[in-house]
Amino acid sequence: MIIVTNTAKITKGNGHKLIDRFNKVGQVETMPGFLGLEVLLTQNTVDYDEVTISTRWNAKEDFQGWTKSPAFKAAHSHQGGMPDYILDNKISYYDVKVVRMPMAAAQ
């Protein structure tokens, strides 16, 4: 399993604009190898909002299949370029080495 994050610096007070874009079912949920998505808002930032989109995939090839799909291209075709509230962003890839799950409650 891999996790891919896209961490964006957003003009202060506008983090909700990016968060709202992900608060609906999209095409990524139908992609082979897609395991889930979380949208994270960093607490206690002073000068800007920081939003991280974290996606989980069976393999890097599955993520690459998503990025080459027509659905991805349509979702990321920002007319006029990147939205002006996004100051910067960084993509990171993580190999998942350990997964721990909660223990079932004792009966």
Curated annotation (Swiss-Prot):
Q: Which reaction does it catalyse?
A: heme b + 3 reduced [NADPH--hemoprotein reductase] + 3 O2 = biliverdin IXalpha + CO + Fe(2+) + 3 oxidized [NADPH--hemoprotein reductase] + 3 H2O + H(+)
Q: Name one GO biological process term.
A: iron import into cell
Subcellular localization is given as: Cytoplasm
Q: Name one GO cellular component term.
A: cytoplasm
Q: What is this enzyme's EC? A: 1.14.14.18
Instruction: Give the highest taxon in the source lineage.
Output: Bacteria
One short Pfam name that applies is: ABM
Looking at the record, the residues that make up the ABM domain are 2-94
Q: Where does heme bind?
A: H76
The molecular function GO annotations come to:
heme binding; heme oxygenase (decyclizing) activity; iron ion binding
Mind listing the UniProt keywords for this protein, alphabetically? Cytoplasm, Heme, Iron, Metal-binding, Monooxygenase, Oxidoreductase
What triggers production of this protein? Up-regulated under iron-starved conditions.
Q: Which residues are involved in binding Fe cation?
A: N6
Q: Which InterPro entries match?
A: ABM_dom, Dimeric_a/b-barrel, Heme-degrading_MO, IsdG
Record-annotated site: Transition state stabilizer = W66
Subunit organization? Homodimer.
Per the entry, what this protein does is: Allows bacterial pathogens to use the host heme as an iron source. Catalyzes the oxidative degradation of the heme macrocyclic porphyrin ring to the biliverdin in the presence of a suitable electron donor such as ascorbate or NADPH--cytochrome P450 reductase, with subsequent release of free iron.
Q: Which family does it belong to?
A: Belongs to the antibiotic biosynthesis monooxygenase family. Heme-degrading monooxygenase IsdG subfamily.
This chain belongs to the protein called Heme-degrading monooxygenase
Organism encoding this protein: Bacillus anthracis
